[in-house]
Amino acid sequence: MRIKGILTGTLLFFMASCEGHPSATASFHIEPIRIQRFDQALFKALESADGGLELRQQYPAMLQLFGMGVLNRRSIDDELFFERIRSYYAEPTLHKLYADALHQYVDVTELEQQLTKAFAFLKEQLPDLQVPVICMHVSGLSQNVLVGDSLLSLSIDKYLGVDYPLYDNYFPPVQRVRMTPQQVSTDYLLGWLMASYPFDGNESVLLERMIYEGKLRYIVSQALGGKEGVDTLAYPEVVEQWCEQHEADMWQQII
């Protein structure tokens, strides 16, 4: 499935609809999305002597994906696998980060509703797009998005708000502005679209990559209700104004 033909055709349809302002209301219906709380299950398992066995039974595919993506462990059947997880999250700062993430995302009902509407919209425009099983995990500020054959998970510890104290030590301000709960739905959708329609252009040509990501962000903005592109980028207004004032210089540097 080639990204250029599919996304270009979709964009042309969007731009032709309602004089360039397509409706974000989907007539296509999907099963309501229920986020699988792997994050909660793992935290509970860490406090139980036989929690590893229960977690393997409840989330085998997600545990495998998590082990490979976060811990670089390929087999969940390794007898030391869960001990490695337990040791990883025993570090006090990481343990507090985990607890804070769970507290922030106790109720995900609104997020589930947003994702249900957004995926229904995407499914209507891109019929071949698979709707994934959606999970949450806590990576310890490492692997943000985990993607399997039919599985998508986001690391919620990276969406605790721009002022979360620990972020100051690891992320610059321009990155922290996107580490908010408001960015979660956008990054779920972008992560899945990028996995479903991977970039097939020339990685050495920045402009090709920009066009690719711009197409995806435009589609995501429409799926989330027609927000302007700057919202999906999550940059503050002062950054947007600077870009507008220096647009010619920016393009000169890029091209």
Explain the meaning of each model-derived region.
Residues G5, T25, H29, I76, ...:
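Short, well-ordered helical secondary-structure segments
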Residues E19-S87:
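N-terminal mature-domain "stem" immediately C-terminal to a signal peptide or N-terminal signal-anchor/transmembrane
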Residues F14-S17:
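C-terminal motif of bacterial Sec signal peptides marking the signal peptidase cleavage site
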Residues R86-A248, Q252-I255:
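Acidic/His-rich structured neighborhood in mature extracellular/periplasmic domains
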Residues M1-L7:
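Bacterial N-terminal signal peptides that target proteins for export
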